[in-house]
Amino acid sequence: MIPVVIEQTSRGERSYDIYSRLLKDRIIMLTGQVEDNMANSIIAQLLFLDAQDNTKDIYLYVNTPGGSVSAGLAIVDTMNFIKSDVQTIVMGMAASMGTIIASSGAKGKRFMLPNAEYMIHQPMGGTGGGTQQSDMAIAAEHLLKTRHTLEKILADNSGQSIEKVHDDAERDRWMSAQETLDYGFIDAIMENNNLQ
């Protein structure tokens, strides 16, 4: 169930679903699994807000366990394509593809709530049953290219070397807000609407 907000206007009452009301304040909620439908919705909202006024920031609240690499990279590419700065605020968690998205916010405007978590790891893939050996080799090569692409983005976003990111992402690596700040993925920890 999506909550409805009722506003008083000069013409009377107007009701919005909560996400439409937040969008009026340039707030986008990226929550749940990153997949094509969700990515299309996020991209459409980014493009709409940028077309509306590209001099104002967009606020992207992130709480995701990750998901599809291609869907996530489409969001990141759009964030980089538009003129508006995209502030990212991690609440709950940014894991896997979520770290790529959250760390791709405008430099100096990447935030995290104090009890949120970050997790980086290498990308996962599979070929399914009954796959030919040559197809498995192609899939393995593609997975290695994808891993390099993601590690380069994380290195660029954090200021760490690709080698360090590669080593740290070998297995699931969970980080607290302070550890995420120290690593360079965020610029500040937000507490009570104040920055630390």
Curated annotation (Swiss-Prot):
Alphabetized InterPro entries for the sequence: ClpP, ClpP/crotonase-like_dom_sf, ClpP/TepA, ClpP_His_AS, ClpP_Ser_AS
A GO term for molecular function: serine-type endopeptidase activity
Highest rank taxon of the organism: Bacteria
GO cellular component labels: cytoplasm; endopeptidase Clp complex
Keyword Mitochondrion: no
Keywords recorded for this protein, A-Z: Cytoplasm, Hydrolase, Protease, Serine protease
GO terms of biological process kind: protein quality control for misfolded or incompletely synthesized proteins
Localization per Swiss-Prot or TrEMBL: Cytoplasm
Pfam family, one: CLP_protease
EC code(s) of this entry: 3.4.21.92
Enzyme's top EC category: hydrolase
CDD domains: S14_ClpP_2 (cd07017)
Transmembrane spans: none
Keyword Membrane: no
Entry annotation: catalytic residues: S96 (nucleophile), H121
Reaction it catalyzes: Hydrolysis of proteins to small peptides in the presence of ATP and magnesium. alpha-casein is the usual test substrate. In the absence of ATP, only oligopeptides shorter than five residues are hydrolyzed (such as succinyl-Leu-Tyr-|-NHMec, and Leu-Tyr-Leu-|-Tyr-Trp, in which cleavage of the -Tyr-|-Leu- and -Tyr-|-Trp bonds also occurs)
Subunit field text: Fourteen ClpP subunits assemble into 2 heptameric rings which stack back to back to give a disk-like structure with a central cavity, resembling the structure of eukaryotic proteasomes.
Family indicated by similarity: Belongs to the peptidase S14 family.
Function: Cleaves peptides in various proteins in a process that requires ATP hydrolysis. Has a chymotrypsin-like activity. Plays a major role in the degradation of misfolded proteins.
Name assigned to this protein: ATP-dependent Clp protease proteolytic subunit
Organism of this sequence: Streptococcus agalactiae serotype V (strain ATCC BAA-611 / 2603 V/R)
Gene name of this polypeptide: clpP
